[in-house]
A protein has these predicted regions:
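Nucleotidyltransferase catalytic core that binds NTPs
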Residues: 1-144
Length: 144
């Protein structure tokens, strides 16, 4: 099964998240997309928004797009690391994972925990984000 993962703090969730989810579903023929909500992105400043509100807001943005599921895995896998989520999802399922991100995240992807392993275990899909294309194309990850 081909699935997409859009991970993040979703603080706030917005139409851009929905747009890249729809585009990824169409372009890569994904059966479902998981919005994996985290309490805190380790590379961003602290969020004061409760996880329950983030999940509620994500569901509001998603609306009737039933191919998108909002999940909070940190209480299950005891981690907010992307590699731990990927390992958890692949453990009992035959998933082909497409990890979706905006160009702003590509800039610092080399700083993510086990970023090389992430890119070996799933397909990384980067979407342009206004104002970030130039810097993302200069990033250490892009140059590799």
């Amino acid at each position: 099964m081909k699935i997409g993962i859009l991970g993040g703090s979703f603080d706030p969730a917005h139409k851009g998240h929905l747009a890249i989810s729809k585009e990824a579903k169409k372009r890569f023929k994904l059966e479902k997309i998981i919005w994996a909500v985290t309490k805190k992105n380790p590379l961003k400043s602290e969020s004061n928004t409760p996880i329950t509100k983030k999940i509620k807001d994500c569901k509001k943005v998603i609306g009737l797009n039933s191919f998108i599921k909002v999940k909070f895995y940190e209480n299950i896998i005891k981690s907010n690391k992307t590699i731990d989520l990927i390992n958890h999802l692949k453990k009992n399922k035959n998933f082909e994972i497409y990890f979706l991100m905006g160009a702003d995240n590509l800039i610092n992807f080399h700083r993510w925990h086990k970023s090389k392993l992430i890119s070996q275990k799933c397909n990384i899909v980067v979407f342009d984000r206004h104002g970030y294309k130039k810097n993302s194309l200069k990033s250490k990850t892009f140059k590799k």
